[in-house]
Structure formats: structure tokens, C-alpha cells
Swiss-Prot record:
Record's keyword terms, sorted: Cytoplasm, Elongation factor, Protein biosynthesis
Transmembrane segments: none
UniProt-recorded name of the protein: Elongation factor Ts
Gene behind this protein: tsf
UniProt source species: Rickettsia massiliae (strain Mtu5)
One of the record's GO molecular function terms: translation elongation factor activity
Length: 309
């Protein structure tokens, strides 16, 4: 049987619909004699075998998502290999559905076993999407934020659709303040601040002490090289440590929306206005791909393999 002629437009349409690779889309259309719906099913049926082949490939793109349900919030990160897939509606719907379940699941291991609308588990659904989309996909991480009373603010930076983007933040404010709307507005503002300023901890005590000592040592050696007397060096080091804290400790950072005030001062003012104590119980900040080693040659190697095969 001679090979059926498949138009470039049909391949392009299938790629846009599924996010699968160009060669995979062309093969699917050839195998199904150009039937578009059957081609989609063909890609889906390849699931398990394709997932195994792609599992070793680096997935550092994708999306983070934030979801709040009352006094519970969750942030997740689902990775793909390319930004193209992150802009694919099928992938976005997958991430959104997983985030909705994550609020209930509470842990990533439990989440992977939860059933989706298709009847498949989250883990099985991801495997099927690997086949359809044509890239390695991974549910990399999730974190939960729960408070007994107060408000949770969320913010997603570089949104591609609501609540999905490159950076996702949750901030939980523990308080019995009666004006929940104002408390939620403050939590939202602090979430935006956290996205932009990337604090490492809420207060001094939350900082990794090994990191503090390393900074202290660097400041000490630098001051010593400047030939300062020991008593001056000590004061200079303490001054630099205070500056370091003001850069990485949330409560000591200058507030994004009122730069003349620290976050701690803004909270103190809000306490006076709302007539109740307010405490930052926890914040979560996920930035897409942080900590993942990017494989620069991955795509080039894949292209070479296609052209040589």
C-alpha cells in the first residue's frame, strides 16, 4: 500500500490540538489514513511505551498552579520539556485538574492515586498525556498551606490562564480579624510581594543558620582585606548581616506596595486598623524549574536523531 499524502496543514492542526511532536503527528495521520479523531486516539494508545522512552528526558518547562479553597491552599508544579507544551490547552487543563484534586489529597503520593474525571488515576492520566503530547511530563512537587482561622492570599506571576503560570505563591495570615475582605486583600498583596522579592524565610529564626554563618564569614574576610581594625570589622560585619537579613527575611523586607515600610510594619498597621493580631503562618513560593539542571543539548540531539533515522 502506498503512503497516503498528509498535508502540512493537517500535521500542524494535530500538533496544535495535541501538542505532540511533528513527526509523531505525521505518523499518526499516516497510520489512520488521515482520520483526525483516530489520529488523536492513536497517539493516546501509544501511552505506556512512549512514557517509558521519554522518562529520562529533562523536563524543566511547564507550569506552576495555585489553588485556594477556604482555609486550605495548594501549590503544584507540573513539568514539560518545552514552553510550547506549557501553552497547549490540553496540558493546561491537566495541570488545572490536578491542582483541584491536590487541595483534597494533601500529599503528592496520595494525589498520584486520586481518580480524575476520566476514571484514571492522576499518575495514569499523566502517562496518557505523555503519549498524546509527545513530551516527558512530571508532577514534580506540591505543598499545602492550611490555617484554622484567617485568610490565604494567592498570586500567580506570568499567568498563561487564570491560576497557572511561571511563579505561584500562597500566603497564609492567621488572625481572628472580623473584616475578612481586608485581611484577604493584605494576604494577596503580601503574596505579590513574595513573588517579586523571593524571601527565604518569614523571620530570622527560619533562616538556615549555615547560610547565615557563611555570609558572616564572607563579610568578615572582605572587611579584613580592607585593613580595618578588629573592633571596626565586628561592627561592619554586623551591619552587613542586618542588610542581608533585610534582603532575605520577609518581615524585614521593604514592602513592595509601600517601600518606606517593612512588611512587619505594614502588618502592625493592619493590626491597628482591624483590631486583631495578624501573623504570617506560612508562605509558599514555587518558581518554575528552580533547582532543575537544564539539558541544553536535548532538543538538538532529538532533531539529529529524527534526521538520521
Amino acid at each position: 500500500m502506498s503512503e497516503i499524502n498528509i498535508s502540512a496543514a493537517a500535521v500542524k492542526e494535530l500538533r496544535e490540538k495535541t501538542g505532540a511532536g511533528m513527526m509523531d503527528c505525521k505518523k499518526a495521520l499516516i497510520e489512520t489514513s488521515g482520520n483526525f479523531e483516530e489520529a488523536i486516539d492513536f497517539l493516546r494508545k501509544k501511552g505506556l511505551a512512549v512514557a517509558a522512552k521519554k522518562a529520562g528526558r529533562i523536563a524543566s518547562e511547564g507550569l506552576t498552579a495555585a489553588k485556594v479553597d477556604g482555609l486550605t491552599g495548594v501549590v503544584i508544579e507540573v513539568n514539560s520539556e518545552t514552553d510550547f507544551v506549557a501553552r497547549n490547552e490540553q496540558f493546561q487543563a491537566l495541570v488545572k485538574d490536578i491542582a483541584n484534586l491536590a487541595v483534597i489529597a494533601k500529599t503528592i503520593d496520595t494525589l498520584k492515586t486520586f481518580k480524575m474525571q476520566s476514571g484514571k488515576s492522576v499518575e495514569e492520566e499523566i502517562i496518557e498525556n505523555i503519549a498524546t503530547i509527545g513530551e516527558n511530563l512530571t508532577l514534580r512537587r506540591m505543598d499545602i498551606l492550611e490555617i484554622s482561622e484567617g485568610a490565604i492570599g494567592s498570586y500567580v506571576h506570568n499567568e498563561v490562564v487564570p491560576n497557572l503560570g511561571k511563579i505561584s505563591v500562597l500566603v497564609g495570615l492567621a488572625s481572628n480579624a472580623k473584616d475578612k475582605a481586608k485581611l484577604e486583600a493584605l494576604a494577596k498583596q503580601i503574596a505579590v510581594h513574595v513573588a517579586g522579592n523571593n524571601p527565604q524565610s518569614i523571620d530570622d529564626s527560619g533562616l538556615d543558620q549555615a547560610l547565615v554563618e557563611r555570609e558572616r564569614k564572607v563579610f568578615f574576610e572582605k572587611s579584613k582585606e580592607e585593613g580595618k581594625p578588629d573592633n571596626i570589622i565586628e561592627k561592619m560585619v554586623e551591619g552587613r548581616i542586618r542588610k542581608f537579613f533585610s534582603e532575605v527575611v520577609l518581615l524585614q523586607q521593604n514592602f513592595l506596595f509601600e517601600p518606606k515600610l517593612t512588611v512587619a510594619e505594614v502588618i502592625k498597621n493592619a493590626e491597628k486598623e482591624l483590631g486583631a493580631a495578624i501573623k504570617i503562618a506560612k508562605f509558599i513560593r514555587y518558581e518554575l524549574g528552580e533547582g532543575i539542571e537544564h539539558g541544553e543539548k536535548n532538543f538538538a540531539d532529538e532533531v539529529a536523531a529524527i534526521t538520521q533515522g
